[in-house]
Amino acid sequence: DIQAAPTVLAEGCRGSLTKQAITRFGLNKGRSPQTYGLGFTELWQLPPGRCQPGLIQHTVGWPLDSATYGGSFIYHLDQDRVCVGFVVGLDYEDPAFSPFEAFQQYKHHPRIRGLLEGGEILASGARTLIEGGIQALPRMDMPGAMLVGDAAGTLNVPKIKGIHTAISTGVSAADHIVETGKAEGFDARWRASASAAELHQVRNVRPGVNRGLWSGLLNAAWETVTGGRSPWTLRTRSDHDSLATL
């Protein structure tokens, strides 16, 4: 039994306790279905002279088809190292599709191969990401406990960036505990924060891709230009609803 009052659940994506808490207390009632992505990351040591420290590169599209959401990032670090990442939404249609194989194919693109050829992988990893956005975010407080970070789903999906929002929820939770000594009221507190406003601005970008890559890119451009001021909020759909049958 957990005796602390309140308890902060910071398990990350799809945590065991978090899933039980969401179900038991109905924290996702009235929310859009949560959606997920799978990301791979590799740290490469490259031959001297190829890196441009501070450069960040993003791609969309190939080797993914226009119906599959995903893309890549390359962070140029110091000491002739780069961090290469590839993320695929788990709402893909083809049941035979392999995100890992797509990542390997991506590295054979002439531009990427030219960067990595002759290099060495120093470390690698994979993890799931929560992509549902603020419309899929569950209530973040319950009797005796709170959700923070990826346990709730505070990733800024278009930027593939969530450390800052996770830290923000943690700081808000700590402040709330110090000031009130309880969990109740934390959800309302966080939703009035700058981090919540940031997620609200980009809420329509990820579900907009459900209609295809090109319409999704047009929608993303609109949402960016307007600062997310569209008078509508697009709903997400469960990832498994997109999967075709064999």
Task: List where the protein language model places each region.
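Alpha-helix capping and helix-loop boundary segments enriched in small/acidic/polar residues
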Residues: 31, 94, 136-139, 157-164
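Extended, hydrophobic alpha-helical segments in both membrane/secreted and soluble proteins
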Residues: 141, 147-151, 163-174
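Ferredoxin-type iron-sulfur electron-transfer modules and their immediate structural context
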Residues: 193-246
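Flexible, glycine/charged-enriched surface loops at secondary-structure junctions
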Residues: 114-125, 181-185
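Predominantly flavin-linked oxidoreductase catalytic cores and closely associated redox partners
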Residues: 1-117, 169-172
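Active-site-proximal substrate-binding core of FAD-dependent oxidoreductases
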Residues: 153-159, 175-216
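FAD-binding beta-loop-beta segment adjacent to the flavin cofactor pocket
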Residues: 126-157
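Flexible loop/turn segments at secondary-structure boundaries
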Residues: 15-17, 91-93, 134-137, 154-156, ...
